[in-house]
Amino acid sequence: MLDHESVRRLRACAQALADGTREDSAETVVRRVFAIQAQDATAADLGIRVRGRDITARAIRIAYEDERSIVRGWYMRGTLHTIPSDDARWVLRLLSPRILAATSRRYQQLGLDDDLRQRADHLIRRALAAHGPLTRAELTERLTTLGIPPDGQAPFYLIRHAALTGVLCHGPQRAGEATYVLLDDWLPSTGRFRWEGDSALTEVARRYLAAHAPATLEDFAAWSGLPVTWARRAWKLLAESGVITEYGGLTMLAGRVEELPGPSDTPDVRMLPAYDNYLIGYRTREMSVPALHQARVWPGGGLIRPTVIADGLAIATWSRGSGARSIKVRAFGPVPPQIQREVDMEKDAVVRFLRPTT
């Protein structure tokens, strides 16, 4: 049986958030955690920063746009995530049918029938082939030729549909704004999927456990958006292959518990962005955020506030202040001097990342 502190430290270490664990590049961060939640582009960049060693915003842009080693798209739960580029196609093939099925009622409400969605896919493909990269506004303007009103949510759902069907993905930023490109142009296909069927299901479950364990199959289902029956099958296949071990109702990759280092004299303080994987990668919250303070992290309305953790335990929320170099930290209680020093250092690091001097 693992106690709460051991579970928390193992999870934080898996996420490169404790015991001094940090990666050296944006690509290795994303490979380690498999997916960074990315509906907010700045929060996604901060999610890479907090797991890295001196990674700059410029280095992250290079990984996205020059190296093309990471890519942003609609994956887990149909939400924007950043994942390794060479995983984009097989993950999309596994997840997109469920996402499209779950969106069918919304398509009906917006009057987007199968024929119209297919015509929109073709129009978007032609537009990007001839004129890409294009912004959402530029694609929306072209969709009006199909009778799609430019206001409302229909353009977004059609652009997202084109992503889920493998037409497009996010491309380079233009003046800080996202653009879209043809997936096959931006990330040329190798001609085959790395994993398919059950092998894809077990691989995405294994990646989840590598980045989140100790966890349950219900945690995996909540994170991925896949049915619990699928998660149960993934667990069964992983168990049959000897990949996982059970510890009192929690699952680990075999051998991972032995990797937990002893406690450090210096607290490892990290400033997580809004919507960070460490906070939302599980069905329940009590391991990382004390119950008394959960409403401060999850205030309602779908918001998840930026949070300060020390050795994996939430101790405060934070926000950007009115000044260009201002960070406000709101602690849940008295902060020991040793932890406060680490908080101050982390604040300075976030400011440097957001407002580089050169």
Question: Across the structure, where does each feature detected by a protein language model lie?
Answer:
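Phosphate-backbone binding and catalysis cores of DNA-processing enzymes
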Residues: 1-137, 141-151, 291
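A short, conserved structural fragment
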Residues: 65-75, 79, 164-173, 239-247, ...
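Short, cationic-aromatic polyanion-contact patches
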Residues: 83-88, 174-194, 250-263
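Short, amphipathic alpha-helical interaction segments positioned at domain boundaries
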Residues: 93-103, 185-206, 268-270, 278
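Internal, well-folded beta-alpha domain core
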Residues: 123-155, 204-248
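Loop-centered beta-sheet repeat module
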Residues: 152-233
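Non-catalytic regulatory appendages
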Residues: 237, 241-292
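Glycine-rich, small/acidic residue-mixed loop/short-helix segments
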Residues: 291, 296-358
